[in-house]
Amino acid sequence: MCIRDSYESVKDNDAKVSDVKEALEDAVHRQLMSDVPYGVLLSGGLDSSVISAIAKKYAAKRIETDGASDAWWPQLHSFAIGLKGAPDLIKAREVAEYIGTVHHEINYTVQEGLDAIRDVIYFIETYDVTTVRASTPMYLLARVIKSMGIKMVLSGEGADEVFGGYLYFHKAPTPKDFHEETVRKLSKLHMYDCLRANKSLSAWGVEGRVPFLDKEFLDVAMALNPKAKMCPGKEIEKRIVREAFADMLPESVAWRQKEQFSDGVGYSWIDTLREITAAAVSDEQMEHAAERFPINTPLNKEEYYYRSIFEEHFPSESAARSVPSVPSVACSTAEALAWDVAFRNLNEPSGRAVRGVHEEAYAEEVK
């Protein structure tokens, strides 16, 4: 696999939509090889919808026989989770009907999520705020998937890192900055989204596979000219992926703005977490946070709350050091905070922190 660290090695390359389409379809085809019942995680966002649509294309035939025989379970099952009326649930339902999957919609309540957080932190082994936020609904979803006898699911993780899909990428000043940030994001993925998907699912014995991170696909995707991936100003992110698969998806989904998983399951999930943790952690505790947690001192009350639970499960210093703890806006690296002066006083991983880009952005700065 070649991640193409150097901008110089890719800056003059082509960026063909057909190359992306062929490489991703091949990746999904490879990842579908399985002797157990499988399904797809369908959030209703672009990435999971693309993976689901491609999987549906191949689901009727056995991959192991190169399509020469019928699949043992030809009906593709898709799964979505969210608070009642969540943006993701509405779009996932639309995609499932369009591509023809057997769709399962799981509603959870904020209280169910809160009740699960202690177990979630134990299984995912991190106190990173965005990972805990997103892992909780995925953990609850995996429980349902396991109960139905599904052993493996395909998921859309990795696309935002490869194609610069997070909303803060709109602020990338140059193609070089854009490309170098995608490389940084990929190099840290095992501490964030891959950790979430792997451990939230495996806690219930479900295997997750991620075609966007297929090695052969990465060879193609990371060699694309970074300029073609950029989304300056109001341009939509991941345009090359949208153009490649627009004919396989409802138009409203193919051109839907990026919504992070922890936002898409329902805005009130994150808002309630912030309220609960703000009430649970006092100002005095935050003032003395460095005394209690000298390693990776929590940057806000929500992180302090998760860190306290983490310490109960994993009290050693080495465990604390294993978790990244840096300021972030919409899942950015610390380096990308320099892209916009408005980022410099922020520390909020939600995409709604990118004011002027997210359609439902916070009215005020979140610190």
Q: Which residues does each PLM region occupy?
A:
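Short, small-residue-biased leader/transition segments that mark boundaries at the very start
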Residues: 1-3
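Non-catalytic nucleic-acid substrate-recognition regions in nucleic-acid-modifying enzymes
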Residues: 283
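ATP-dependent adenylate-handling active sites, centered on carboxylate activation for C-N bond formation
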Residues: 5-249, 263-278, 286-367
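Conserved S-adenosyl-L-methionine
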Residues: 250-260
